[in-house]
């Protein structure tokens, strides 16, 4: 069981170090405000933590961190591998300023074959649940969708939602273009469809040769029985598999039983660090992705430290491959922790030959190219920020974080305000926020803007007053004209804020590139040239705010309309409404349903089905 050690009110670091145990565990460094600076793990807490205060050979990042340490907390663990897992959990939960962080806001997607009687092939992101089958993870959503398109051509599995599948009375377009066998209307037997599902799973598991032999046998049997159309279908499948197999990763170490393999290539150049991840599942290269940690607090990054941090954050508590091939060593404690979670032995390979060596070299080249591209991108983004800083009369070093607000509604219905964030030279989707407008009258954009600005920045003031760390924007962008920007100025006066404001209005022509910028504190209203880097930055953030607001508004509006349409029907309460929507996949499905279909829903009598049908028609 973990044992916590916490700091006294007046923390004495030398005394604390003297009493530390010679045991494995995790330590946390805090600054004077109580914010976590750094989380680390140790085989020997006393030796490791004392080293920070007794040595002078730290990297610039660690040296800067040590100067700010006010107090320390430790947690004793049973082993180094347990400490490593706990360290990773703390890092993910606390996001310490001086830890190496590979930010990835979403879980990785999978290709799913559902547990339905006629399984659906689908893109999936979330908790893995039985009896569904999952294949992956894939580096991004496009990799999953590309795989689905390929599998549709060969195995013709359905991709429609269960609610649609169960209420079709004729095949859809995918059947006509030979991408689905239309099990929804009985054009294929359950047994034959399940054969196709098994074949798809066999392919996804990398057993392409086995699948090809099975299909060849089926083709020969069909031809012998004079079923030439069916034989031709098997022939086409075999040919398609041959094309796909030519693009496969053939592992010279194990060519007949492909493993799940990840290749990791580390590259470090001029203060930038990149880890390039290549995902191979069942012998197929399903995608790759480059990861860049934040190195702004570390002018001389140590590549091995970053590589180890990536492996811990990328794999602990997540799906793992059978083999990790990398151009850097993985520490024994980390190997032990990964294998403990995986439940079986994993291979960690750094010396490669054959196809493995070729693929790892390609991954290294991709990592180096990604760094070059990142450097160009940073140069371009910095140029945009420099130009905007000049316009605002600011030092470009003081202009990093922008927040932009927009209001969206349909004639006053379902009003939503959006706040999007641009920081660290990129948009930050994980920091976006939507606000349901509750106090403003329908259609009153000015009151809606007042509400969202007051709520967001009033709450930030309260948090800061309570000692919490708050990220204030360096400038705030308002999507709107003089009316909206006037409201923002009023809120600023009420809250005592001194953050620069920029209004961006479409102008009389309402054309892109012809926007008017409003700087309320100087009274300036002007246009920038269409090729202005500063204008491009403002347009990017403004357009993202508009997109985020309108998608949120549409979801809220559509949900309200569905609820309203069914709630008006006598005898349909929340449970029956939900049962109808679940069964038919939404309001359109309910409207399209016959009286007989409605009767089949639990809780819907014949008389109520008649009432619902008449109300909707």
Curated annotation (Swiss-Prot):
GO molecular function term, any single one: DNA binding
InterPro entries associated with the record: GIY-YIG_endonuc, GIY-YIG_endonuc_sf, GIY-YIG_UvrC_Cho, Hlx-hairpin-Hlx_DNA-bd_motif, RuvA_2-like, UVR_dom, UVR_dom_sf, UvrABC_protein_C
Keyword DNA repair: yes
An annotated GO BP: DNA damage response
Keywords linked to the UniProt accession: Cytoplasm, DNA damage, DNA excision, DNA repair, Excision nuclease, SOS response
Domain UVR: 209-244
CDD domains associated with the record: GIY-YIG_UvrC_Cho
UniProt keyword DNA repair, yes or no: yes
Record localization: Cytoplasm
Pfam families referenced in this protein's UniProt entry, alphabetically: GIY-YIG, HHH_5, UVR, UvrC_RNaseH, UvrC_RNaseH_dom
Domain GIY-YIG as annotated: residue spans: 22-100
One annotated Gene Ontology cellular component of this protein: cytoplasm
Function as written in the Swiss-Prot or TrEMBL entry: The UvrABC repair system catalyzes the recognition and processing of DNA lesions. UvrC both incises the 5' and 3' sides of the lesion. The N-terminal half is responsible for the 3' incision and the C-terminal half is responsible for the 5' incision.
Family: Belongs to the UvrC family.
HAMAP family on file: UvrC
Quaternary state and interactors: Interacts with UvrB in an incision complex.
Protein name: UvrABC system protein C
Organism: Neisseria meningitidis serogroup B (strain ATCC BAA-335 / MC58)
């Amino acid at each position: 069981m973990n044992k916590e050690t916490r700091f006294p009110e007046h923390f004495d670091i030398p005394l604390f170090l003297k009493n530390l145990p010679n045991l494995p565990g995790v330590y946390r460094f805090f600054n004077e405000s109580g914010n976590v600076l750094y989380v680390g793990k140790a085989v020997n807490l006393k030796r490791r933590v004392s080293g920070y205060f007794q040595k002078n050979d730290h990297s610039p990042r660690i040296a800067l961190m040590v100067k700010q340490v006010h107090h320390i907390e430790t947690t004793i663990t049973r082993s180094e591998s347990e400490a490593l897992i706990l360290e990773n959990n703390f890092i993910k939960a606390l996001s310490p300023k001086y830890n190496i962080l590979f930010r990835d806001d979403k879980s990785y997607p999978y290709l799913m074959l559902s547990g339905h009687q006629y399984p659906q092939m689908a893109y999936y992101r979330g908790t893995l649940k039985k009896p569904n089958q999952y294949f992956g993870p894939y580096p991004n959503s496009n990799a999953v969708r590309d795989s689905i398109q390929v599998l549709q051509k060969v195995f013709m599995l359905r991709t429609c939602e269960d609610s649609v599948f169960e209420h079709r009375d004729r095949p859809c377009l995918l059947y006509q273009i030979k991408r689905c066998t239309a099990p929804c209307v009985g054009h294929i037997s359950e047994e034959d469809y399940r054969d196709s599902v098994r074949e798809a799973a066999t392919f996804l598991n990398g057993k392409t040769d086995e699948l090809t032999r099975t299909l060849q046998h089926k083709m020969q049997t069909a031809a012998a029985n004079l079923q030439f159309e069916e034989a031709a279908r098997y022939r086409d499948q075999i040919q398609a598999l041959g094309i796909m197999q030519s693009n496969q990763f053939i592992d010279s170490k194990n060519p007949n039983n492909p493993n799940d393999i990840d290749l990791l290539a580390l590259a470090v150049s001029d203060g930038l660090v990149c880890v390039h991840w290549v995902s191979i599942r069942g012998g197929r290269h399903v995608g790759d992705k480059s990861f860049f940690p934040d190195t702004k607090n570390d002018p001389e990054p140590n590549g091995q430290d970053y590589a180890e941090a990536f492996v811990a954050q990328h794999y602990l508590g997540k799906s793992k491959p059978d083999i990790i091939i990398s151009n850097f060593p993985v520490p024994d404690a980390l190997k032990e922790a990964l294998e403990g979670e995986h439940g079986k032995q994993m291979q960690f390979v750094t010396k490669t030959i054959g196809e493995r060596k070729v693929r790892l070299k390609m991954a290294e080249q991709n990592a180096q190219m990604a760094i070059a591209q990142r450097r160009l991108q940073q140069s371009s983004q910095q140029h945009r920020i420099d130009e905007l800083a000049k316009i605002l009369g600011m030092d470009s070093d003081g202009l990093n974080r922008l927040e932009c607000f927009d209001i969206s509604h349909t004639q006053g219905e379902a009003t939503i305000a959006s706040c999007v964030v641009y920081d660290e030279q990129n948009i930050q989707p994980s920091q976006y926020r939507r606000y349901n407008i509750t106090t403003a009258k329908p259609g009153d954009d000015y009151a809606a803007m007042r509400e969202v600005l007051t709520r967001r920045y009033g709450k930030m003031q309260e948090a800061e007053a309570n000692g919490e760390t708050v990220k204030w924007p360096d400038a705030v962008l308002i999507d709107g004209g003089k009316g909206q920007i006037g409201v923002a100025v009023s809120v600023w006066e009420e809250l005592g804020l001194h953050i620069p404001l920029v209004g961006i209005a479409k102008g009389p022509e309402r054309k892109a590139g012809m926007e008017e910028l409003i700087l309320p504190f100087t009274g300036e209203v002007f246009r920038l040239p269409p090729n202005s880097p500063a204008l491009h930055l403002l347009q990017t953030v403004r357009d993202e705010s508009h997109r985020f607001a309108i998608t949120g508004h549409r979801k809220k509006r559509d949900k309200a309309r569905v609820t309203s349409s069914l709630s008006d029907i006598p005898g349909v309460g929340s449970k029956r409404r939900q049962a109808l929507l679940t069964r038919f996949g939404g309001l359109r499905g309910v409207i399209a349903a016959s009286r007989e279909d409605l009767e089949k829903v639990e809780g819907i009598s014949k008389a109520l089905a008649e009432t619902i049908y008449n109300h909707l028609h």
